[in-house]
Amino acid sequence: EFGEAGLDHDLIEQSSEEIVLMQSGCLCCSVRGDLSKTVVGLLDRRKDSEIAFERIVIETTGLADPGPLMQTLFVDHILAKTTRLDGIVTVADAANGVATLDAQFEAVSQAAMADLIVLSKTDLVTPQKVKNFEKRLRALNPSVRIVHAVRGEGLTDQIWGLSVLQPKAEKKDVLAWTLGETPQLDPLANLSGFAPAQKLSAPIPTHDTRIGSASIVLDDPIPSAAFDLCIETLISIRGPDILRIKGLVFLEGFDAPFVFHGVQHVFDLPVQLKDWPKDDRQTRIVIIARDLSRPELQRSLDLLRTHTSTPLPAS
């Protein structure tokens, strides 16, 4: 929670799970060290049979940027070995979400980096307003899954198992994770390439124009060295602006694909799947970034296209 006086833990009516409150500040900045210590402490207590659990749920303040949290899980040497990020769930208020996106760039980042967006208060607004809000969210994050919730009902089975970074991931989940739905109206069409440009009746909100996305699909296998070089070049030059990059990759010399994802300059370990989710054996990569134009994003990804047809020089 943000601030020294914690409140949310007192509002839970009943819980059999372990609740840990960190009061030293905003999770996106000053308490990242506390996060590591807290999670390690929970793991130690589980090892000593004091408590039993399978998952750890981290609820941040609405002011938080998910990026630093994800980086902590990736780079902390203990957490990287003992935990795996299952996914980012963002709750978006259907009644006030548009105003929040206009006013708070943190909200834009939360939407752009989410694996799942839960729309709340959909019963308080018209279906058309919900539809328009979903279109705006998909413009920020084309591959995100969006579900509706009224008073939190029906969510229990939908917020788990979001990550496909596991060998036994379901084929349909892998495809949804890398492709998502193609937006019908994209106010960022000049950036994302997911839809043709359309004349808008209102100006695009300033925060939204800072977020762009691009994708690439490749039929031929990529040399491992070429893939590493292209990704390392991208993150070394524009790492701080990369909100998220993820993909399904066909590497030379491997029968099954790898899935990977990263935030800014930090990447989780790639995981090889047991099989291809489709018969086409295509590499699919999606990148969501801040303050990068569509041509810049596409040029970075097109380096991979070059290396699928041109052998790397011998070292």
Task: Briefly describe each language-model feature range.
Residues E1, L35, E59, I88, ...:
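Residue-level signature of catalytic and energy-coupling elements of molecular machines
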Residues V57-T60, I117-L119, S215, I285:
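Short glycine-rich or small-residue beta-strand-to-loop segments that form or flank ligand, phosphate
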Residues V31, I58, K121, D219, ...:
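Small/polar loops that bind or transfer phosphate-bearing groups
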Residues L69-S143, H148-G152:
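Conserved catalytic-core segment of NTP-binding enzymes
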Residues F2-T100:
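Nucleotide-state-sensitive switch-loop elements of NTP-binding domains
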